[in-house]
Regions:
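A solvent-exposed interaction/effector surface
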Residues: 1-210
Length: 210
């Protein structure tokens, strides 16, 4: 059976429907940065997702080609994730999605080196005839965070965030969202195929002890 990050690391991908504390270690990602309303058809955000999956599957399917990745094992491509912020507000203003800035990411297995990533960029560019110059190798260590499973529409996230904020305050922490630690979402459902009320999204915020 292919290694499934969601099942093997449930503490990061399958939180309960109530807030909980988690310490997230250093991870490597395929990443694309941008600024746009994520709901725009043919917009920058949706194009970024195409780029991410292009590289993710080039790496996954390397097992069938000449480029051998040391330590490779078969795996399920991890879910799409996103770091979100807006320059003009403290937190997230869901009524002005056109102001969203974001880093879209897909987690990389630890065996993928920067050299393997660079090979995948060249290989995908050659095979798919697309421009992958915006795609980067990103390393992040989120550290101490609060997270919660949000069930339902993305537009209903403020209620889950409010519950997280109350949990943070009640337990002697405070939000630590900054230019380097951001609002984080992990998408466990495909919004193109799942009804809004059935979407499952992990929401994660950085925190620090008071």
């Amino acid at each position: 059976m292919p290694f499934d990050f969601k099942k093997e690391y449930k503490e990061f991908y399958m939180p309960k429907g109530k807030p909980e504390i988690v310490t997230v270690p250093k991870m490597n990602y395929i990443a694309v940065r941008g600024k746009s309303n994520p709901n725009e058809e043919e917009g920058e955000y949706k194009k970024s997702i195409e780029l991410l999956y292009g590289i993710a599957y080039t790496i996954k399917m390397s097992k069938k080609g000449d480029h051998k990745i040391e330590g490779y094992f078969d795996y399920v491509v991890p879910p799409l994730e996103g770091f979100w912020w807006q320059e003009t507000v403290d937190g997230i203003d869901y009524s002005h999605k056109e102001n969203f800035q974001w880093i879209s990411v897909i987690r990389l297995p630890d065996f993928v080196t920067k050299a393997d990533f660079d090979w995948a960029i060249e290989e995908a560019t050659r095979k798919k005839k697309m421009d992958f110059s915006k795609v980067e190798f990103l390393t992040l260590e989120e550290g101490l965070c609060v997270q919660c499973m949000h069930s339902g529409s993305y537009d209903d996230e403020p209620a889950t965030v409010a519950a997280m904020d109350k949990f943070i305050a009640d337990n002697g922490y405070e939000n630590d969202i900054s230019d380097t630690r951001r609002h984080h979402e992990i998408y466990l459902s495909d919004a193109r195929k799942v009804a809004p009320e059935k979407l499952k999204t992990v929401i994660r915020h950085p925190i620090k002890k008071l």
